[in-house]
Amino acid sequence: MQIPFQRALRLCLRAALAAIASAAHADDGTIVITGTITDTTCVIEDPSGPNHTKVVQLPKISKNALKANGDQAGRTPFIIKLKDCPSSLGNGVKAYFEPGPTTDYSTGDLRAYKMVYATNPQTQLSNITAATEAQGVQVRISNLNDSKITMGANEATQQAAGFDPEVQTGGTSRTVTMRYLASYVKKNGDVEASAITTYVGFSVVYP
């Protein structure tokens, strides 16, 4: 039986389009993503509040304190404290500082923006990154031994220090106090005198 010409043409066109679509959607590779969700739960005690927002106030410094790229100044400690952790909680609880709009992947530090942060009413995070980026300076997050915690790196390579739980007063639950540093850090360009603000989100990582 012969197939009519027009029908044969339609079949050929369909086959050609299918081949083109298949080629257009061909993959160059595959990303396999894995993870683990634990039923371990702790309560974030500090920073408190519904959004667990902590304001770390760096000291007012002279721009002359930041001369060469990588120079740090104004190191300021801050804590993230957990409570009501289960007694079975293991050692090495730490913060994972999440990548976000303020992350500079080329330096591993946080972009700083020329603005004053307000707490009442609270400045919206989107307003921070909408401000003009500060020149010549960023903000670095470090461990207490001053080793850099690399922003934009994954949890395994970020190098944030882990902390061990302690028995909570008056019970068997545990508390964890994580201690880190924030500081100014010199980057390319001349440092401009101005107020600066930046931010970074964090997640608690359990052993």
Curated annotation (Swiss-Prot):
It is found in: Fimbrium. Disulfide bonds join 42-85. Keywords: Disulfide bond, Fimbrium, Signal. Coiled coil: none annotated. The keyword rRNA processing does not apply. Residues 1-26 form the signal peptide. It comes from the Bacteria. One of its GO terms (cellular component) is pilus. Its main location: other. GO terms for biological process: cell adhesion involved in single-species biofilm formation. InterPro entries: Adhesion_dom_fimbrial_sf, Adhesion_dom_sf, Bact_Fimbrial_Adh_Pro, FimA-like. Bordetella pertussis is the causative agent of whooping cough. An essential step in the disease process is the attachment of the bacteria to the ciliated epithelium of the respiratory tract, enabling the organism to resist normal host-clearance mechanisms. It is unclear which bacterial cell surface component are responsible for adherence but the fimbriae of B.pertussis are prime candidates for being involved in this process. Belongs to the fimbrial protein family. This is Serotype 2 fimbrial subunit.
